[in-house]
């Protein structure tokens, strides 16, 4: 493993998210740590197709922060404080936006610096993708993000990932730098940026982010007929019928499970939670959520 004692990346500055300066540091043909997972198809927040259209200056659907994102920002300082209390060996410092010393297009904004290591801070609403504290089990898109940060700043010492799984389950993970993974991400980013320059968008995938991006591309409405190719028409009709059938089957399965759950909260099977009930104040069911 290659190590570094100080960042070799170039600090562009510390910017408040959402400000013109913050947007300036991220705009154009560059790839940030929060974007790399989308490029390799692992981001739950964005598809490569949507990101491509943003980079190409084409329309995209308006961004709306989810409650999970908003609360994650609010809890960030609290989680950082817990990490600092448990690890007093070095001060835990806020930092800014960096670019790679040789690759101007490679950008990252880590949450904190701790000595010569990065610290990324998260919150989560459930523990399904998170292993025990100290394990190597956590969401893959965060691994992409942290690897990109390590590679951008040149800090190849193991990074730390601190997460608060709501309401009060605090866990930590150590993320080793992997040069093979970093090279794979760089190559994917270079191909992606080249496709933007060449005007060749990624293939259409099944993400809602991709669908919503396509939805806002038309700038007018022409009352005309358009002949659709056979494979596209067939997929739409056949898969649409299958979707209707499976939706009805799934609704039936939910109804049966909810009836079996009664007034309870967690639906268990052989010691494993498979769903949980969210109740209104009067005890009636507001939602039945799958365990994730």
What is each PLM-predicted segment?
Residues 1-292:
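Accessory terminal regions of nucleic-acid processing enzymes
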């Amino acid at each position: 493993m290659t190590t570094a004692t100080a960042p070799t990346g170039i600090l562009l500055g510390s910017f408040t998210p959402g400000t013109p300066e913050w947007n300036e540091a991220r705009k154009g043909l560059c790839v940030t740590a929060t974007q790399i997972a989308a490029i390799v198809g692992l981001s739950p927040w964005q598809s490569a197709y949507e990101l491509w259209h943003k980079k190409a200056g084409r329309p995209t659907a308006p961004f709306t922060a989810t409650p999970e994102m908003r609360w994650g920002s609010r809890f960030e300082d609290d989680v950082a404080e817990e990490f600092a209390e448990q690890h007093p060996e070095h001060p835990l410092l806020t930092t800014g936006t960096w670019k790679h010393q040789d690759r101007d297009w490679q950008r990252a904004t880590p949450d904190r610096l701790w000595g010569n290591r990065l610290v990324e801070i998260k919150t989560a609403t459930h523990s399904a993708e998170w292993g025990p504290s100290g394990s190597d089990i956590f969401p893959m898109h965060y691994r992409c993000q942290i690897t990109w940060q390590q590679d951008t700043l040149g800090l190849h010492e193991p990074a730390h990932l601190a997460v608060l799984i709501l309401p009060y389950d605090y866990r930590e993970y150590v993320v080793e730098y992997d040069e093979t993974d970093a090279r794979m991400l760089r190559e994917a980013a270079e191909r992606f940026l080249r496709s933007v320059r060449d005007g060749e968008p990624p293939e259409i995938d099944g993400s809602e982010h991709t669908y919503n991006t396509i939805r806002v591309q038309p700038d007018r409405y022409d009352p005309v007929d358009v002949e659709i190719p056979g494979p596209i028409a067939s997929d739409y009709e056949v898969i649409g019928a299958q979707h209707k059938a499976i939706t009805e089957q799934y609704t039936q399965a939910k109804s049966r499970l909810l009836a079996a759950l009664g007034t309870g909260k967690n639906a268990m099977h052989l010691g494993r939670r498979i769903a949980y009930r969210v109740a209104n104040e009067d005890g009636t069911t507001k939602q039945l959520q799958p365990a994730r």
